[in-house]
């Protein structure tokens, strides 16, 4: 399951939900007919409950959405704080040179001289750009996910090549 965001609050009295998205293109979520909700983002697939998306629209830096089965504010309050996710195959295909964070986590990171720098353990959104969290044992490197440093992402080979030195 790919975690997309989190329900942060009810929105109004008719069951609408305010969503904090974790990615940079939450408008693409409208293409999905169903969303899945869970209390624990790392829980088993069986813990995710499927909801049909009735409506979704941008709101500020996030989204507001209406799910079937959430008819009023009380029902919305009952699922506040839940994570929003979707199976990878339910997600819209990313554009060229765009990636879902979940597809990058676990990839090996090497530099231009083929030195292994570690493995992507997560990403951080800083507002200006995303940052790869690369772990190698006890060492963590934070590498900006921008063209100046990220030279190639090869999902098939499960490798990211970067312009970064091991001792930085």
From Swiss-Prot:
GO biological process: ribosomal small subunit biogenesis; rRNA processing
Ranges for domain PRC barrel: 96-168
Molecular function terms, GO-annotated: ribosome binding
Signal peptide range in chain numbering: none
The protein's name in its UniProt record: Ribosome maturation factor RimM
Stated role: An accessory protein needed during the final step in the assembly of 30S ribosomal subunit, possibly for assembly of the head region. Essential for efficient processing of 16S rRNA. May be needed both before and after RbfA during the maturation of 16S rRNA. It has affinity for free ribosomal 30S subunits but not for 70S ribosomes.
Assembly and binders: Binds ribosomal protein uS19.
HAMAP family assigned: Ribosome_mat_RimM
Keyword annotations of the record: Chaperone, Cytoplasm, Ribosome biogenesis, rRNA processing
Domain remark text: The PRC barrel domain binds ribosomal protein uS19.
Cell location: Cytoplasm
Any one Gene Ontology cellular component term annotated for this protein: ribosome
Species, as recorded: Azoarcus sp. (strain BH72)
Pfam families reported in the protein's UniProt record: PRC_RimM (PF24986), RimM (PF01782)
Gene: rimM
Family: Belongs to the RimM family.
SUPFAM superfamilies: PRC-barrel domain, Translation proteins
């Amino acid at each position: 399951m790919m975690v997309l965001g989190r329900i942060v609050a009810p929105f109004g009295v008719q069951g609408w939900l305010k969503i904090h998205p974790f990615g940079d293109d939450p408008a693409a979520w409208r293409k999905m007919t169903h969303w899945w909700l869970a209390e624990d983002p790392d829980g088993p697939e069986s813990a995710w409950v499927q909801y049909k998306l009735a409506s979704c629209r941008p709101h500020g830096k996030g989204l507001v959405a209406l799910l079937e089965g959430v008819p009023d504010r009380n029902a919305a309050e009952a699922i506040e704080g839940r994570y929003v996710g979707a199976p990878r195959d339910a997600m819209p295909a990313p554009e060229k040179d765009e990636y879902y964070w979940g597809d990058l986590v676990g990839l090996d990171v090497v530099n231009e001289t083929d030195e292994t720098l570690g493995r992507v353990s997560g990403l951080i959104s800083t507002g200006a750009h995303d940052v790869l969290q690369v772990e190698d044992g006890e060492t963590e490197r934070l590498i900006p996910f921008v063209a100046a440093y990220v030279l190639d992402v090869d999902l098939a080979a499960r490798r990211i090549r970067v312009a970064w030195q091991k001792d930085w």
